């Protein structure tokens, strides 16, 4: 009460549901929600986990403390991980009323001197290597908005978890951001209905094969 500007962040352990730390941490946070503003979640998972959990935050209690996803990543330093991480960020933007902050971790690692993999940026005495995951984080960091626009993707049956999208707008600039992630082995044709994207339109992105450790600019 004396320091209303202080935000109290609790912890729910190093793993996601259904770990014991996660369950007990959330129980404590909800019971003490008067004092706990948000909780810090951590998880590192396989690309397959991210593909199959694109609804992870949909069922979260909107009245509970918020989520700071303080450490997270897919477990390889490849294009595949960059794609599934982008899918997860699309899902997080959809649930921005629950997940208020995210931070990829770890960030920096010297080649051949690491005790954790993956990291976002690798370096040695002369070179810097940016992983595909770096490019995902960069795109989302500079193409944000303050309003999420509900959208629907229509893709062939059985392929729903291989494609993701997020649409956000910026109320100050009037800009609209349509984010599309395609983890299929073929290109997609995109038709945008219900959103005026005429006028000045710019395309940013990258592409590559699943095992690639470097990216190519989008055509």
Model segments located where?
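N-terminal catalytic cores of secreted or lumenal carbohydrate-active enzymes
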Residues: 1-4, 10-28
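An acidic- and aromatic-residue-enriched active-site/binding cleft used to recognize and process polar
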Residues: 4, 11-16, 41-44, 72-75, ...
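Glycoside hydrolase catalytic-domain groove-lining segments
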Residues: 5-9, 28-80, 158
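Short, solvent-exposed loop/turn and secondary-structure capping segments
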Residues: 20-21, 49-54, 113-115
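A general structural detector for well-ordered alpha-helical segments in enzyme core domains, enriched
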Residues: 25, 53-56, 87-88, 133
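Aromatic/acidic polysaccharide-binding cleft in carbohydrate-active enzymes
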Residues: 64-167, 171
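Carbohydrate-binding surface patches
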Residues: 160-199
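Acidic, Ser/Thr/Pro-rich beta/coil linker or hinge segments at domain junctions
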Residues: 197-219
């Amino acid at each position: 009460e004396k320091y209303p500007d202080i935000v109290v962040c609790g912890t729910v352990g190093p793993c996601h549901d259904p770990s014991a730390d996660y369950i007990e941490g959330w129980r404590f946070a909800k019971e003490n929600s008067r004092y706990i503003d948000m909780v810090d979640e951590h998880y590192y998972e396989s690309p397959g986990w991210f593909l199959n959990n694109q609804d992870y935050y949909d069922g979260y209690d909107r009245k509970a403390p918020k989520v700071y996803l303080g450490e997270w990543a897919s477990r390889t330093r490849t294009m595949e991980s960059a794609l599934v991480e982008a899918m997860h960020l699309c899902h997080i933007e959809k649930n921005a009323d629950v997940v208020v902050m995210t931070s990829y971790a770890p960030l920096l690692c010297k080649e051949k001197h690491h005790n954790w993999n993956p990291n976002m940026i690798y370096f040695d005495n002369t070179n810097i290597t940016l992983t595909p995951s770096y490019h995902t984080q960069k795109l989302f960091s500079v193409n944000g908005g303050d309003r999420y626009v509900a959208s629907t993707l229509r893709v062939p049956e059985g392929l729903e978890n291989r494609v993701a999208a997020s649409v956000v707008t910026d109320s100050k600039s009037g800009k609209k951001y349509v984010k599309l992630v395609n983890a299929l082995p073929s290109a997609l044709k995109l038709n945008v209905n219900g959103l005026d994207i005429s006028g000045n339109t710019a395309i940013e992105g990258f592409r590559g094969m699943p095992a690639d450790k470097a990216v190519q600019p989008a055509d």
